Design a protein with these regions (language model features):
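Serine-dependent carboxylesterase/thioesterase catalytic core
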Residues: 2-9, 14, 22-36, 40-133
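A conserved mid-domain beta-alpha-beta active-site/ligand-binding segment of alpha/beta enzyme cores
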Residues: 135-137
C-alpha cells in the first residue's frame, strides 16, 4: 500500500523527508505531493491532487498523511469526484475550522503575497463550511 505525503502551507516536500524516511524504513512505499501556494491557486492545487489520487487509487490501496493545509487540500480533492477513498487519512495539525492566527497574518502584505488564495481561504469561515466531510477509517 502506498502512502501519499502532503506538506503544509509555505512548506515543501523537504519538511516531510524524515517522516518519509521513517515510513520507508518500516516497509511502506511513499510518494510526495508538492505545491507552491505563491504560484498556484487553491483550486489548481486541488485539481492536481485529485488527478494524483485517481492514479493512486487505480494502483490499489493507499493512505494519506497530510500536514496543515495539506489536509484541507485532501478534503477538497476527495470531495470532487467519486474517488476510491484512502484506507487511512492522517491529518497533522490541519485547521478544520478558521484559525485565528490566519486573520492576523492576512493583514501582513508578505503573508498575502506568499500564500495567495490558499491564505485567503484560511480567513474565510465559509471556506471551511464548504469543504466536504470525508469518512475514512
Amino acid at each position: 500500500m502506498k502512502i501519499l505525503l502532503i506538506h503544509g502551507l509555505s512548506r515543501t516536500s523537504l519538511s516531510l523527508l524524515s517522516l518519509e524516511w521513517y515510513l520507508q524504513q518500516s516497509g511502506w512505499v511513499t510518494e510526495q505531493f508538492s505545491y507552491l501556494a505563491v504560484s498556484e491557486t487553491f483550486d489548481c492545487i486541488v485539481e492536481r491532487l485529485r488527478v494524483r489520487l485517481q492514479i493512486l487509487a487505480s494502483q490499489g490501496a493507499y493512505s494519506i498523511v497530510a500536514h496543515s493545509l495539506g489536509g484541507l487540500l485532501t478534503r477538497a480533492a476527495l470531495g470532487l469526484s467519486s474517488l476510491e477513498m484512502p484506507r487511512h487519512i492522517v491529518m497533522l495539525g490541519t485547521p478544520n475550522q478558521l484559525p485565528r492566527l490566519a486573520l492576523h497574518a492576512w493583514r501582513l502584505a508578505p503573508f498575502r503575497w506568499w500564500t495567495g488564495q490558499c491564505g485567503l481561504n484560511l480567513t474565510n469561515p465559509d471556506f471551511f463550511t464548504s469543504l466536504p466531510n470525508i469518512e475514512s477509517p
